[in-house]
């Protein structure tokens, strides 16, 4: 119908709220009039399409469709939600009861209030407010802020309010806050008393400028706030704590160190312990071979049997050795048999070491059998021996090599052959297979002494001077004479 559109659309826009796209007038937030709703339904019964109804009545398509849809579904043309809105639960009766409960028990929870409303029959399951609704009621309608009056009596806004409990802090009066305009009384415009004004003037006269004024006011406030709660001794202790710097000093002074800690870990307290260790080490002396290696020591002869009765003595005239302490290798069962001895003689300035005698097959070819039955030399813990010695050749090195095991030493050895007795020399006129000669100073072949075991030691110990293992000084042919080459080959095969 056009009756709601006959008026001036501009006046309707200013009066009702606006004009829609089709030129019809509508009012913001208000439903369509019942007359228009009835006309939409009548045109729909006549078979007019919704789009034509919208053009004729100048009502939007959405509005026509919504009204017709609700009419076809419910048979009603009344405006409103289909299911209806939830009834209001925050009735004055419920709000009064909630305020009553909070006044009786200020710490009561919202869910407890809800259960009590149901238990007392004030609300049923359909009308009881939710927990969030109860919290909102308490926040907005029950706990109203109090506005104190100049005479100190609180003025509450009309409605449901709670009496302030004794646990809540009282509102500070004008005389308790010397800060002035930044106080509650200053913000609320409450005039200060004469005593407050006089105290304010005294604080202002004590300060020397703006900074002094603010500092004095802060100090007076601090003293005033603490005067009723702490004793004088407590105040002094608090002042000392606040005057202490916030960050500790990196270099801590001696006064912060505990006296017992300083006496326990001081250098004079530690010195007697060091002296005891030194005296115990020196007192043990030669009793324990592994405890002290500073003094010279002598070691017994280790003897082993040869297949042939051969007596050979090697005497190195000069040696510079680093002291080492090999363990005793003498065996009572082998000490009586001494067919082959090598004596090592050094200067008086160096420790004296007894000879180490090795056993093996004839013709001077040393085997790799252990010296002591049931014990391999690789398991010994000799301080002078390297820990990575291969077990197959541990018991087959001559004395000169043992003397050269210590890295960084230069050993100068001169071999001299002493008169030797063997059955080959005494029973035959042929040259002796073992080069037994009655003269001294004879030396042997000059071939490089390149045994694989000694090459391994040369690489492992990294000798600064490898001449001990590879130079021809070990055996030379200058004084060998007319010895057969077969004999030399047989002797030098090790």
Curated annotation (Swiss-Prot):
Residues 18-74 are annotated as: PAI subdomain. Induction: By activin. Weakly by bFGF. The keyword Nucleus applies. Residues 93-141 are annotated as: RED subdomain. GO terms for molecular function: DNA binding; DNA-binding transcription factor activity, RNA polymerase II-specific; RNA polymerase II cis-regulatory region sequence-specific DNA binding. It holds the Pfam family PAX. GO terms for cellular component: nucleus. It is found in: Nucleus. Residues 15-141 bind DNA. The keyword Secreted does not apply. Residues 163-175 have a biased composition (Low complexity). One of its GO terms (biological process) is negative regulation of transcription by RNA polymerase II. Its main location: nucleus. Residues 142-221 are annotated as: Disordered. Keywords: Developmental protein, DNA-binding, Nucleus, Paired box, Segmentation polarity protein, Transcription, Transcription regulation. Expression becomes spatially localized at mid-gastrula stages and is localized to the nervous system (midbrain, hindbrain, spinal cord), sensory organs (optic vesicle and stalk, otic vesicle), visceral arches, developing excretory system (pronephros, pronephric duct, rectal diverticulum, proctodaeum) and thryoid gland. Splicing does not appear to be tissue-specific. SUPFAM superfamilies: Homeodomain-like (SSF46689). Probable transcription factor. Involved in kidney development, acting synergistically with lhx1/lim-1 in pronephric morphogenesis during the tailbud stages. This is Paired box protein Pax-2-B. It comes from Xenopus laevis. The gene is pax2-b.
């Amino acid at each position: 119908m056009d009756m709601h559109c006959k008026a001036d659309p501009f006046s309707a826009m200013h009066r009702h709220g606006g004009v829609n796209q089709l030129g019809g007038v509508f009012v913001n937030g208000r439903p369509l009039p019942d007359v228009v709703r009835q006309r939409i339904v009548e045109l729909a019964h006549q078979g007019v399409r919704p789009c034509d109804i919208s053009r004729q009545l100048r009502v939007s398509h959405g509005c026509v469709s919504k009204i017709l849809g609700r009419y076809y579904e419910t048979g009603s043309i009344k405006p409103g939600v289909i299911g209806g809105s939830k009834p209001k639960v925050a009735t004055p009766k419920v709000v009064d009861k909630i305020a009553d409960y909070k006044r009786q028990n200020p710490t009561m929870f919202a869910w407890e209030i809800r259960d009590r409303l149901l238990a007392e029959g004030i609300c049923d399951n359909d009308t009881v407010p939710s927990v969030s609704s109860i919290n909102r009621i308490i926040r907005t309608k029950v706990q109203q802020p109090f506005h104190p009056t100049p005479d100190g009596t609180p003025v509450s806004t009309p409605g449901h309010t709670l009496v302030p409990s004794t646990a809540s802090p009282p509102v500070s009066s004008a005389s308790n806050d010397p800060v002035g305009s930044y106080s509650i009384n200053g913000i609320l415009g409450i005039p200060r008393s004469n005593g407050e004004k006089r105290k304010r003037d005294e604080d202002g006269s004590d300060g020397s400028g703006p900074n002094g004024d603010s500092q004095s006011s802060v100090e007076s406030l601090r003293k005033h706030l603490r005067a009723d709660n702490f004793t004088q001794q407590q105040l002094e202790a608090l002042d000392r704590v606040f005057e202490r710097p916030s960050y500790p000093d990196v270099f801590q002074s001696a006064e912060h160190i505990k006296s017992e800690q300083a006496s326990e870990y001081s250098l004079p307290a530690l010195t007697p312990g060091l002296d005891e260790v030194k005296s115990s080490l020196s007192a043990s002396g030669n009793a324990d071979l592994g405890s002290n290696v500073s003094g010279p020591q002598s070691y017994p002869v280790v003897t082993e049997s040869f297949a042939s009765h051969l007596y050979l003595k090697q005497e190195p005239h000069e040696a510079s050795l680093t002291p080492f302490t090999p363990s005793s290798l003498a065996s009572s069962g082998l000490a009586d048999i001494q067919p082959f001895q090598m004596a090592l003689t050094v200067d008086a300035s160096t420790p004296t070491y007894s000879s180490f005698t090795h056993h093996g097959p004839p013709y001077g070819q040393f085997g790799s059998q252990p010296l002591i039955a049931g014990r391999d030399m690789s398991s010994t813990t000799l301080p002078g021996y390297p820990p990575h010695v291969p077990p197959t050749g541990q018991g087959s090195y001559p004395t000169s090599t043992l003397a050269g095991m210590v890295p960084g030493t230069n050993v100068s050895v001169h071999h001299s052959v002493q008169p030797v007795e063997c059955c080959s020399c005494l029973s035959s006129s042929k040259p002796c297979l073992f080069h037994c000669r009655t003269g001294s100073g004879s030396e042997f072949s000059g071939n490089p002494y390149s045994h694989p075991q000694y090459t391994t030691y040369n690489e492992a110990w990294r000798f600064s001077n490898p001449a001990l293992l590879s130079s021809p000084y070990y055996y030379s042919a200058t004084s060998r004479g007319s010895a057969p080459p077969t004999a030399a080959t047989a002797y030098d095969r090790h």
